[in-house]
């Protein structure tokens, strides 16, 4: 019983109902497409082929990377392993060998960023992924080429995505976590490159307003007449 793995002390009946209702909904997704016979239909493959093993779907990494997946590793490590191996199979079965940042059930990618990189890297660091080669090849391709990230060339050249502060901050965080996976696997050169790139968040911090702000391609912050608003 997944709900029973967390035992609460204190709290009234209403608070307990609220907690376990939220936990129940948290565990509904991502969802497995594996059928009782051990096979699955793949919405990621070009022709909807049938494969063996786990397959994961119905999850958006933009918010789940910092909520659902850490919870799985802490409380449900068996579930985390099954789910992450299902995502690695999704990478294998996709024609471009990339992870859908939002799957429903196939590739939708309606969320910005590449936060799935963080969940896959976390899986490597927690020894929750069986096919580490496929997982790492995805991480390398996604962080070091234009195949995985929108506006990658500008991001690599300028250190940020012009006009998009949220997207840039997402990339910095992904770079940092993937650098830790690279270090763990012994890829020191790539680890150093990504770690240094992750520190470029400083480029978007405006000391006048004390906010992160978007920059133009020429390196300028927007000019506000009233910086208190």
Which positions does each model-derived feature cover?
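Aromatic-rich carbohydrate-recognition surfaces in CAZymes
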Residues: 57-182, 195
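Short, solvent-exposed loop/turn and secondary-structure capping segments
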Residues: 32-39, 70-73, 82-84, 209
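Catalytic cores of carbohydrate-active enzymes
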Residues: 98-99, 179, 184-229
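Alpha-helix N-cap/helix-initiation sites
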Residues: 12-16, 81, 191
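Acidic/polar, glycine-enriched structural segments that form the non-catalytic walls/loops
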Residues: 1-56, 88-89, 96-97, 133, ...
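Extended glycan-interaction surfaces of carbohydrate-active proteins
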Residues: 22, 39-43, 47, 132-163, ...
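Generic structural "secondary-structure junction" signal
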Residues: 10, 29, 35, 57, ...
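Sec-exported extracytoplasmic/periplasmic mature domains
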Residues: 4-8, 22-28, 73-76, 88-92, ...
